[in-house]
Amino acid sequence: KVHKSPFKSIFNEIFSSGEYPRSLSFNSPLGESKVNLYSCDDFSTFNLIFCRQDYLYRNKQKIILDIGSNIGLSSIFWLTRSKDTVVHCYEPSTENYEKLKKNFQDFVGRFFAFKKAVSSKNFSTLHNIEKSGVYNSIRNLNKNQN
């Protein structure tokens, strides 16, 4: 049981309701944890990760790379599985990066956050920022590079 009030959570998910930003307390293998959510999109993402269990966890993951971390929900999933897990997060959006750091306050020493994008190429970028931050993207400004 992840949510303390499952029926209220289902209602909020279906009707995209609830007040934001808000702090959500939830049950994890390490006990009670909390996360800051900033939109109903964040709440929906939280439910996909924590309730639908989109990630396979086998108690072997010690180092996690979270590329495009957004506000850190995926990283928090891994950090709440084991006290031995360390997460390296990469998030280029300034707004999301600040939210991510706030969400990691309970995990000092177990995460490393970088305000950077990750690519196999070096290029100047244009950030396409979407209001919730869930659908942000990066575009190469040099049209001669693929």
Feature names for model-found ranges:
Residues 1-146:
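Phosphate/nucleotide-binding beta-alpha loop and adjacent structural elements of enzyme active sites
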